[in-house]
Amino acid sequence: MSAPDVRLTAWVHGWVQGVGFRWWTRCRALELGLTGYAANHADGRVLVVAQGPRAACQKLLQLLQGDTTPGRVAKVVADWSQSTEQITGFSER
């Protein structure tokens, strides 16, 4: 039996709006087989919600914290929980 899916909620701070960050995140998440979304917020942060296997979510978190993202990431505040919401695909909001 496989482990249950997890939910990664990551608040990405920095220069991450208007630079293709949500599109880039969507591409990486889909490559990893994750579902969820990336959404701009009025305060300049991007909220990333990803669901799927823990290893894939951890890889996405590493990518979000890495130096290959569009723009400039100052910090990522991440929270882990059980996947309870039914989300299909990965969208930009």
UniProtKB/Swiss-Prot annotation:
Q: Known catalysed reaction(s)?
A: an acyl phosphate + H2O = a carboxylate + phosphate + H(+)
The alphabetical list of record keywords is: Hydrolase
Q: Which domain of life is it from?
A: Bacteria
| Domain Acylphosphatase-like residue range list | 7-93
Keyword Cell membrane included in the entry's annotation: no
> Does the record bear Hydrolase in its keywords?
yes
Q: Which Pfam families does the annotation name?
A: Acylphosphatase
Q: What is its EC number?
A: 3.6.1.7
GO terms (molecular function) for this protein are: acylphosphatase activity
User: Can you tell me which residues form the catalytic site?
Assistant: 22, 40
The entry assigns this protein to a family as follows: Belongs to the acylphosphatase family.
Q: What is this protein called?
A: Acylphosphatase
Protein's gene:
acyP
